[in-house]
């Protein structure tokens, strides 16, 4: 999975009113990976996707897909991309099957009923193929959007906020669908405001803010590099203050005054936990239980955006 399928080089976009939506972005996306783009509203993620998909023209820079330029080889690159928009853009009075098969014709592809049947079955839509869209739930309509985007057999799938407005159960269901699609060799790029979504399914994460890429990193590595763990030491009884002998650990007394929190770097050679527990014992405190909590991608994201805004 080392081959770069999408190569973005010094891409920028400035609108007529002077607004700079993208500031010389460079990014490579690997073939067969799930790449999550995170960013606050107005960060530039939608503009970036729109340029790659040929909807918006860049002001400068280049994008190639499998070696083809998105402007010089527009038809070639567009046929390799499937786009699932956030809005439910579907013909409500048409059947599921007709919605999906019609999309294939828009790319100049000949009818291929076996392929349409395959993706409808893959997305658990085959038994609903003759139903009209207006009869389906929101979650099923979103599946139809994915089926439409896959109808012309693209090798890249863009998902713009794929689980926006759906409940937790449907969201997790959608994650499973994305994982299954990846197994077929499709490269998946998703934008999301649900940071746990990126944490759960993405191989790599790119954080975009104010038109710039702040960081691109493997999800696990980002969590490892910037993640901290919190150790909560639960006590057998209340204490009014943390003993002075424990000052060096920068502990925080819990709200119930029956626990103390210790934050440490997971990358450090020595976390200091062993010494801390011994010093707690020496201070005469009685331990009841220990709990650890890993820093989340959400906390890291907020931290990165805050740092970028302060520059």
Model regions and ranges:
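Conserved ABC transporter NBD signature motif
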Residues: 61-72, 77
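Conserved ABC ATPase "signature" region
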Residues: 101, 105-128
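Conserved catalytic motifs of ABC-family nucleotide-binding domains
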Residues: 153
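Catalytic Walker B motif of ABC-type/P-loop ATPase nucleotide-binding domains
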Residues: 157-160
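ABC transporter nucleotide-binding domain
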Residues: 175-264
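Short, charged/small-residue-rich alpha-helical element at the C-terminal edge
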Residues: 231-304, 311
């Amino acid at each position: 999975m080392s081959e770069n399928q999408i190569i973005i080089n010094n891409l920028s976009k400035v609108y007529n009113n002077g607004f700079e939506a993208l500031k010389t972005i460079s990014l490579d996306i690997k073939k067969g990976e799930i790449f999550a783009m995170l960013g606050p509203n107005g960060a530039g993620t939608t503009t970036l996707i729109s340029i790659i998909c040929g909807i918006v023209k860049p002001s400068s820079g280049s994008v190639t897909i499998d070696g083809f330029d998105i402007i010089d080889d527009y038809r070639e690159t567009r046929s390799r991309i499937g786009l699932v928009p956030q809005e439910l853009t579907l013909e409500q009075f048409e059947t599921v099957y007709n919605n999906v098969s019609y999309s294939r014709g828009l790319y100049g592809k000949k009818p291929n009923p076996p392929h349409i049947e395959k993706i409808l079955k893959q997305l658990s839509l085959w038994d609903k193929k003759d139903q009209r869209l207006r009869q389906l739930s929101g979650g099923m309509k979103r599946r139809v959007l994915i089926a439409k985007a896959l109808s012309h057999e693209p090798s890249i799938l863009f998902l713009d906020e794929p689980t926006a407005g759906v409940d937790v159960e449907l969201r997790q269901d959608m994650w499973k669908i994305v994982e299954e699609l990846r197994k077929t060799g499709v490269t998946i790029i998703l934008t999301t405001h649900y940071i746990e979504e990126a944490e759960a399914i993405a191989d790599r994460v790119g954080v975009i803010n104010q038109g710039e890429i702040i960081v691109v990193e493997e999800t696990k590595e980002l969590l490892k590099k910037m993640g901290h763990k919190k150790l909560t030491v639960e006590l057998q009884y209340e204490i009014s203050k943390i003993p002075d002998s424990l000052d060096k650990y920068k502990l925080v007394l819990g709200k119930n005054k029956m626990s103390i929190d210790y934050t440490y770097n997971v990358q450090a050679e020595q976390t200091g936990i062993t010494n801390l527990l011994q010093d707690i014992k020496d201070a005469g405190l009685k331990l009841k239980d220990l709990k650890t909590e890993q820093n989340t991608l959400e906390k890291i994201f907020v931290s990165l955006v805050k740092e970028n805004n302060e520059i």
